[in-house]
Amino acid sequence: MNTSLRLNHYWITCADGLETLLQEEIEQLGTKVTERKAGRLIIEGTLEHAYRICMWSRLASRVLLPIHTYELERTHDARDVAEELYEGAISFDWSLIFAPQSTFAIRLHAEREIKVNTQFATLRVKDGVVDSFMEAVGRRPSIDTKQPEITLYVLAGKTEHTYCLDLSGDSLHKRGYRRFMTDAPIKENLAAAILQKAKLQERNPEIVLDPMCGSGTFIIEALMILTDRAPGLVRRFGFNGWHGHDRELWLSLKAEAAERHEKALEQPLPKFYAYDADWEAVKATRENIIAAGFEKLLGDIQIEERTLADWPDFGAENKTAFIVTNPPYGERLGDKASNRSLYLGLSALLQKNFPNQYAAIIAAQIEQADVLAFEAPETLRLMNGKLPIYVRFGTVKLEKVTQPFLANWQAQPVEMEEAQDFANRLQKNMTALKKWATKENIYCLRLYDADLPDFNLAVDLYSDRLHVQEYAPPKKIDPEKAKKRFNLALAAIRAVTGLNRDAIFIKTRARQTGTNQYTKQSTANKRFIVQEGKAKILVNLTDYLDTGLFLDHRQMRLRIAQEARGKHFLNLYSYTSTASLHAALGGAASTTSVDLSNTYLSWSKENFVLNGLTVDHADEQHMFFASDCFEWLKEGHEQYDLIFIDPPTFSNSKKFHGTFDVQRDHVSLIKRAMNRLTSEGTLYFSNNYRGFEMDEEIEALYDVEEITSETIGPDFKRNQKIHRAWKIQHPGLN
């Protein structure tokens, strides 16, 4: 009987989680799966069936042919597994499988309950094979662990050891095209599995996008699927040195695969987009595409260095798109919080650019996948090597186009017996601000700021939530009376705004001191996203006295956004770096943010990532420094075109030697900053100290213009002393 037609059992291995998809693929190749185990399927078929799997399986890891089973006589605790493996190896005549002039290697895998030193046991298996050859033919084969002609896969079990010929040789996920690597790559067979699970071919997309392409694995695997390119067409296999190899059969299968690929290339292909913020990744993608044999298709593939914030207009309104990506979930990014912000930002971009289109996104934690706005989402858990990953599949939801809260708010009659004056004033303020907020798309603003002496509080609107700060009453005021009045105010706030209790966040603000300025108020972490201009910003209404966004500096931030294009921007006392964020989104050549607090710098990075910008990147476009601003200015020499300084009134942080007083120290601070300002640059200086006066020395040294009125929005017109601001330039520019 022709050995190529003989039925044998073969083991087809795969990554954990791929068993179902692999079974579907194998059965589509015309082979029946007879048994299924974790990470392994068993088939019964001919050599042609095995060869077809080697050639065409995009998901399998290895194709193994069991050659020899060594049954154990006893399984007591004191067993010597390594010696058992040696006995099993020497008991079989390996010269029947391959020639002594061939090189070979051993891959040993032990079942979980088997305790064995795998390195030593592998050597004993090698000894057994070599000794078997010496007994049979008097010659021994050589070991080659890097590129062996024959690989023997050995499974050490509880009742038997199984010795297999690895027909695949190297793992099947190694297609041969990955010449250049990036951090945290996805294995080729996992990428293919994700594409097959997502039904890429059936969807017949006109656009295929990977916005964080790394080394280009998804793009290349998609090309292979859509051009009917067999993954085994150009790679080496482990059966060429096997005595049972049918060369003619294999060559016929290769010819068939090549013909199918050539025929598929005649069909139209989608437009491919491969983007990454890292130029090295872009270069790796291009080189790997060429190595995969798709150089002629480069005209259909746009490979560019782009951040998420720099997406072009894809013109996808009337086209079918497919989006797939493996975001840098730790290896190329920072902490979990920044990763969550990345997924939030990616989700928002998908909703804006690709609503109702299908996407498949990898996440390292399920919580990251959960923020993706998908209809009818599905999740697949896989192992990428030793790393568990979650793949979220689904149709991108339509973007929710929201209007500012005041745009839809209508004044209603409100009767508050003991707080009628307050209710009337709040309603009057909201009515006055409504037109402006609607026209300018203002989502965050101050509605009330201690307008009435009996109601000493501030009411700030953040999207559809309120932040109510009760200023600590003077000691002469009865605490119970103050508490009652505050509760009356809260009732009036709910009545006037129509917001529920769970949308109102309450804090008590005492007079600012150096130690409590940024003191954490609770252990909650309830950040949410608000919009300001082009920027999405994370705010927190529960954990700190300040929310992450100083509303009174809105106009200054928007001004910086307009002036920043092409400029190098420096932000001192940057807090959550929202001014830097506006500068970056406004097209700044670079941004540098300096603050003493690591907490707020981490928050800053989350804001940047949320908006699709890179942080801690090799090109140093957006940099963050945890440092005292005085020391930082003294130590560096870089020049900046645009500088913003918004220092605290007073500070005596443990990290800062001595104290900072804005009135006392602003002269030396501004002079140091001006040394870092380019000759035609602009420095904006602002602070919230009500009694602040700009020193005459600064006015004598530089061109100084107070611009306070230009930086206070309509919501703060009732409190002209909320801050003061100056525009400072080197003399002779005006």
UniProtKB/Swiss-Prot annotation:
Keyword Heme among record annotations: no
Compartments, as annotated in UniProt: Cytoplasm
One GO CC term, this protein: cytoplasm
Cited InterPro entries: 23SrRNA_methyltr_KL, DNA_methylase_N6_adenine_CS, RlmKL-like_Mtase, RlmKL-like_Mtase_CS, RlmL_1st, SAM-dep_methyl-trfase, SAM-dependent_MTases_sf, THUMP_dom
Keyword line: Cytoplasm, Methyltransferase, RNA-binding, rRNA processing, S-adenosyl-L-methionine, Transferase
Enzyme Commission number(s) from the entry: 2.1.1.173, 2.1.1.264
Molecular function terms from GO: 23S rRNA (guanine(2445)-N(2))-methyltransferase activity; RNA binding; rRNA (guanine-N7-)-methyltransferase activity
Reaction(s) the record says it catalyses: guanosine(2445) in 23S rRNA + S-adenosyl-L-methionine = N(2)-methylguanosine(2445) in 23S rRNA + S-adenosyl-L-homocysteine + H(+); guanosine(2069) in 23S rRNA + S-adenosyl-L-methionine = N(2)-methylguanosine(2069) in 23S rRNA + S-adenosyl-L-homocysteine + H(+)
Entries under SUPFAM superfamilies matching the protein: S-adenosyl-L-methionine-dependent methyltransferases
Keyword Chloroplast annotated: no
Transmembrane region(s): none
Major enzyme class: transferase
CDD domains for this protein: AdoMet_MTases (cd02440), THUMP_AdoMetMT (cd11715)
Domain THUMP: 49-167
Protein function: Specifically methylates the guanine in position 2445 (m2G2445) and the guanine in position 2069 (m7G2069) of 23S rRNA.
NCBIfam families (UniProt xref): PRK11783.1
Sequence similarity: Belongs to the methyltransferase superfamily. RlmKL family.
HAMAP family per UniProt: 23SrRNA_methyltr_KL
Protein name: Ribosomal RNA large subunit methyltransferase K/L
Organism: Acinetobacter baumannii (strain SDF)
